[in-house]
């Protein structure tokens, strides 16, 4: 089932690495009740598109941080996240989902195809979750180069609503 705007955000529990969470602390969706929350799902640490997306978010961190809590989510390990954060100076935390529970619950673990070969992977998607823990916006299949602009616009729209 594909999530829609207005749906309750699926509950999650994971280990957050980076930002105020340091080398890793448990977090869950309910920790963010009363706050705007952005979960951006990306395929893999330290690949060209994902690095571009993360570094663009890093470069606009002040603007984003003033409007919402932000977490990147991928199926990479916490150790992989630590290396990615250090290598690129990312100021925001990343959630590790090696068992693919969060990506499946959010409907972003999908069949993909490259050079005729089918495989499963994470669809680059961002969910903006309101203070009531309901989904207020979804940016699906975003291109890394456009992500920050689309996210900033969506957050401004939420602030004006």
Annotated model-derived regions:
Residues 1-161:
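Chalcogenol-based redox active-site neighborhoods
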């Amino acid at each position: 089932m594909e999530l829609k705007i207005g749906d309750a955000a699926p509950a999650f529990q994971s280990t957050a690495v980076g930002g105020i969470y340091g080398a890793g602390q448990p977090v869950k969706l309910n920790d963010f009740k009363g706050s705007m929350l952005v979960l951006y799902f990306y395929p893999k640490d330290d690949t060209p598109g994902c690095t571009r997306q993360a570094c663009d978010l890093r470069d606009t961190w002040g603007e984003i941080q003033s409007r919402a809590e932000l977490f990147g989510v991928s199926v990479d390990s916490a150790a992989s996240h630590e290396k990615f954060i250090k290598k690129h100076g990312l100021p925001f935390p990343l959630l590790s989902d090696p068992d693919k529970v969060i990506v499946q619950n959010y409907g972003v673990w999908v069949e993909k195809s490259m050079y005729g070969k089918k495989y499963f992977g994470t669809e680059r998607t961002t969910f903006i979750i309101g203070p009531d823990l309901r989904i207020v916006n979804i940016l699906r299949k975003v291109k890394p180069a456009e992500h920050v602009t689309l996210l900033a616009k969506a957050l401004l729209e939420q602030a004006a609503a």
